[in-house]
Design a protein with these regions (language model features):
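Active-site-adjacent pocket-lining segments in enzyme domains
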Residues: 2-14, 18-20, 24-44, 54, ...
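A cross-family phosphate/adenosyl-ligand binding-site feature
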Residues: 51
């Protein structure tokens, strides 16, 4: 059975940051088994516009997204400091509480940092100066 991986899309998402979906959606080895289903989720079912301008129609809204997913991926972009992004924090908390995989790219990782989700885990993301702009308090180890 394929596992669902949900990619969170906000308007202004970095479409190149969705590269991970390609690796998950096809078999890594030619003629190999495809283990994942890639789906998109957004605040509503309305069209989402990334930085590159293509229109993306999400599979699910935050209200009707499935509960039986394996991973939640926050794609970077320029709207992670918006009120729209704040709707994602409860989704991340619920995913982590249920021991689901949560991953983020670029400003998605900064969003996780700014909400304290990465306080106790090693992670990569934007540089220290960028994180300070987000108001992130951290300890370097």
């Amino acid at each position: 059975m394929k596992q669902k991986v949900l990619f969170v899309l906000l308007n202004g998402y970095a479409d190149w940051g969705a590269f991970l979906s390609t690796a998950l959606h096809v078999a890594v080895i030619p003629d190999g088994e495809i283990k994942y289903e890639v789906h998109t989720v957004a605040p509503t079912l309305d069209t989402v516009r990334p930085i590159g301008g293509f229109r993306t129609l999400p599979d699910y809204s935050f209200e009707n997204m499935p509960k039986d997913y394996a991973a939640l991926v926050l794609i970077g972009g320029n709207r992670w400091e918006s009120p729209e992004a704040e709707l994602v924090a409860p989704l991340v908390k619920e995913a982590l509480d249920k021991d689901k995989i949560v991953r983020a790219i670029c400003n998605g990782a900064s969003f996780l940092c700014s909400h304290g989700f990465l306080n106790h885990v090693k992670h990569t993301g934007n540089g220290i100066d960028q994180l300070k702009k987000w108001g992130v308090q951290f300890i370097l180890t």
